[in-house]
Amino acid sequence: MRLLDLPLLLVLFLTACGGSGAAKPATVDIASFKYKPATVTVNAGAKVTWVNRDTAGHTATFKSGLDTDRLEKGDRKALTFERPGRYRYVCAFHAFMSGEVVVE
């Protein structure tokens, strides 16, 4: 291999390894009075969407004030998480339901 080929190979390698830079979204299904998955991990700037597949109304309510509001069966709501941290949430109607969003 010629020495001049090394920089080209390095550029190709780094391009192949690099991501798009966009934060990948996550989805949380609500079914059988549970958040599935109970914990999601996303990068800062990502959207998390809650989809209610249950017969009862539910929320994803955070202490910080973020809230999906009441979601009836088939409803969905996305929230965007800008700052790294761990964000626990509960259903305002069913306190035994809880989940967590981990933002890296």
Tell what function each PLM region has.
Residues L6, L10-E104:
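Extracytoplasmic copper-binding redox domains, predominantly the cupredoxin/blue-copper superfamily
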